[in-house]
């Protein structure tokens, strides 16, 4: 079904992409802030699990501070998901959900609120605050009108994220079979696009990861098989037809 190839590089223990076992076979070097990555894919493709694996293992090793914001899922649900992956969320990870805020204020400006939260934690933790995950852009789009004004807001939001000097993982939905049909202009603005998916192989459903775009970094573009290991997701190796 798949073949494990030799390592493309050696990833240092404290690198963000080193938080997922097997990524050393896929990328030649790590990403350094400011860097914005889109994590895309259909429902059930483990986008959140991918981000939580990278973030949790990285923060456990480095002692840096990270922020995970979820628009739809509660903190309790995320924690149960992390436990099922074998991940122990560190104290230096702040998980915040917007579910209560959404119920209280239907007209809430989520991008503005997120900016204020990032600014707060940057003031509190300084350069120790290195990593941010937003789960998800699709949820924010579903709660707002996607028009020219929203696209300008998104452009400004990406500029803001870069100004905060963070490694950023933005989760967004993508339907099965589509290549780059994202809802706004974020596909052009992001430094990397990592597509999570599912393939049918030998009568089984295999979860996959594929790097479609990654600026400044040499990377393999083959579709990779992924599975749950002892400490979150792991890359098993490339899939071949």
Where are these regions (language model features)?
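Loop/turn-to-beta-strand initiation segments
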Residues: 65, 92, 127-131, 163-171
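Structural motif
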Residues: 38, 131-135, 169, 194
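Pre-Walker A adenine-sensing motif
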Residues: 18-30
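Phosphate-binding/switch loop-helix module in NTP-utilizing enzymes
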Residues: 102-164
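Conserved nucleotide-binding/hydrolysis micro-motifs of P-loop NTPases
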Residues: 72-76, 99-103, 137-139, 174-178, ...
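Phosphate-binding/switch region of NTP-binding enzymes
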Residues: 167, 172-232
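C-terminal regions of RecA-like/P-loop NTPase motor modules
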Residues: 1-13, 220-241
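Conserved P-loop
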Residues: 33, 37, 42-108
């Amino acid at each position: 079904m798949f073949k494990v190839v030799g390592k493309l590089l050696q990833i240092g223990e404290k690198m963000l992409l080193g938080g997922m076992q097997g990524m050393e076979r896929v990328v030649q070097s790590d990403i350094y802030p400011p860097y914005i990555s889109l994590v895309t894919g259909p429902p059930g493709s483990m986008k959140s699990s991918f981000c939580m694996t990278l973030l949790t293992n990285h923060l456990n090793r480095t002692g840096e501070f990270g922020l995970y914001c979820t628009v739809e899922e509660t903190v309790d649900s995320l924690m149960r998901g992390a436990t099922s992956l074998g991940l122990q969320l560190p104290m230096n990870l702040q998980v915040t959900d917007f579910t209560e805020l959404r119920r209280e204020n239907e007209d809430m400006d989520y991008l503005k609120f997120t900016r204020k939260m990032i600014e707060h934690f940057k003031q509190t933790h300084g350069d120790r605050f290195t990593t941010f995950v937003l789960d998800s852009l699709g949820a924010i789009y579903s709660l707002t009108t996607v028009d020219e004004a929203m696209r300008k807001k998104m452009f400004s939001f990406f500029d803001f994220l870069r100004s905060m000097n963070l490694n950023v993982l933005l989760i967004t939905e993508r339907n099965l079979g589509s290549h780059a049909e994202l809802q706004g202009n974020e596909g052009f603005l992001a430094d990397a696009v990592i597509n999570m998916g599912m393939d049918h192989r030998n009568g089984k459903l295999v979860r996959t990861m594929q790097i479609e775009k990654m600026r400044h970094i040499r990377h393999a573009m083959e579709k990779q098989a992924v599975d749950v290991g002892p400490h979150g997701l792991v890359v098993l190796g490339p899939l071949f037809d």
